[in-house]
Amino acid sequence: MTELEDLPSVGEKTAQKLRDAGFADMMRLATATPKELSVKVEIGEGVAAKVIEAARKAEKIDFETAFEVMERREDVGRITTGSKGLDELIGGGIETQSITEVYGEFGSGKSQISHELSVTTQLPVEEGGLDGEVVFIDTENTFRPERIEQIAEGFGLNIEEVLKKIHVARAFNSSHQILMADKINELIQSGVNIKLIIIDSLMAHFRAEYVGRESLATRQQKLNQHLHTLQTIANTYNVAVLITNQVQSKPDSFFGTPTKAVGGHVLGHASTYRILLKKGLSGKRIARLVDSPHLPEGESVFKVTTEGLVD
């Protein structure tokens, strides 16, 4: 295994700065951009580019065959949602190395799914979990440990142990939200077995802070960088990312869904899976798979009970 000190242009001092900035992992370093590394490690962009290039050579980042990609995808894990129908709709559960976006109107079940997955991630692999811990970035004050207790009881789990494995950050603005996402690298590198990152909700602060067309470009640029960070973490550490999102009305829509997810094309391209949630009759929820690289569109119906999601 190549150490940071083995890379050209990296001495002991630079290696320590890299570790302090969250770049202890060689793959994390190899997938960084020169500008990102320059800012976070406080080195020149020229030096940063050389360090990244050396890390890429050490990790042998190059073209690979489709067969090799298929073999690598065998490492992808999936986390059960608690609903068999919803799991089947999305190919077996929430996928690692991917960003899954769940969007819908208020009360459609977005935060319920977030709380459910905070528990199911901790289940053994044979029971649909990944035997891992969770990061929950809460932007709208929706996280409730009492709800976690109810779901954990439903699975017969030790409530205290479940709560201890959920790392909650209350983000008060978009800059704080971005900072907490950046700090996930440090948490993982410290030895915490993070297997799911939840942001509930992704766009709340961005929408509130960047108002008007004149600020749209800045908002989308920051959002793009934020999503890039999340995808890099997902790829580097084989972690699943779940983001919940708000909707806005489509006044020109005469057919189909009268609402659309906020975040524009930047978010649309970044999300590997997009799931629309709608309220149904008798307390039921309807999940529609809107976008996926390999799965067809479809729908699933589930209910939210005291003990979690059920078919």
Swiss-Prot record:
GO terms for biological process: DNA recombination; DNA repair. ATP binds at residues 104-111. One of its GO terms (molecular function) is damaged DNA binding. Keywords: ATP-binding, DNA damage, DNA recombination, DNA-binding, Nucleotide-binding. It comes from the Archaea. Pfam families: HHH_5, Rad51. SMART domains: AAA. InterPro entries: AAA+_ATPase (IPR003593), DNA_recomb/repair_Rad51_C (IPR013632), DNA_recomb/repair_RadA (IPR011938), DNA_recomb/repair_RecA-like (IPR016467), DNA_repair_Rad51/TF_NusA_a-hlx (IPR010995), P-loop_NTPase (IPR027417), RecA_ATP-bd (IPR020588), RecA_monomer-monomer_interface (IPR020587). Involved in DNA repair and in homologous recombination. Binds and assemble on single-stranded DNA to form a nucleoprotein filament. Hydrolyzes ATP in a ssDNA-dependent manner and promotes DNA strand exchange between homologous DNA molecules. Belongs to the eukaryotic RecA-like protein family. This is DNA repair and recombination protein RadA.
